[in-house]
Amino acid sequence: HEYQCLEYAIENSLPIFGACRGMQIIAEYFGSTFKKVENHISSRHKIKITGQSIFKSILNKIENVNSYHNFAIDILGDDLQTVAICSDDNTIEAIQHRDHLIFGQMWHPERENPFNKYNNQLILDFFNG
């Protein structure tokens, strides 16, 4: 059903924001492949912004993110671009679509305690365009 939701949102020009598995679904839908990774379960790491994004100014303020995943993108689908990587091992941590308002990140903003104001701002800016 996830693909049907993506297709509906794309057909109706709705924004799509995916966190963790949500990013993986977006990436898979657009033809990305995955590899197993280590040291990304219940850990934290720094991210490095690598691509252009309308959210770059906010992403640059998010230095350290949580990590709860076993898989990372191996080959990124053609319609997507890398926005951020893990500073430790260069795994892709954030992506966006080249033509549609579709953004994905591997970290969980809802698992931060207290909430990170820059994660909150990223989500607000995304949906308020």
Predicted regions span which residues?
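A generic structural signal for well-ordered coil/turn residues at beta-strand boundaries
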Residues: 41-43, 91, 101
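Cysteine-nucleophile active-site neighborhood
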Residues: 1-54
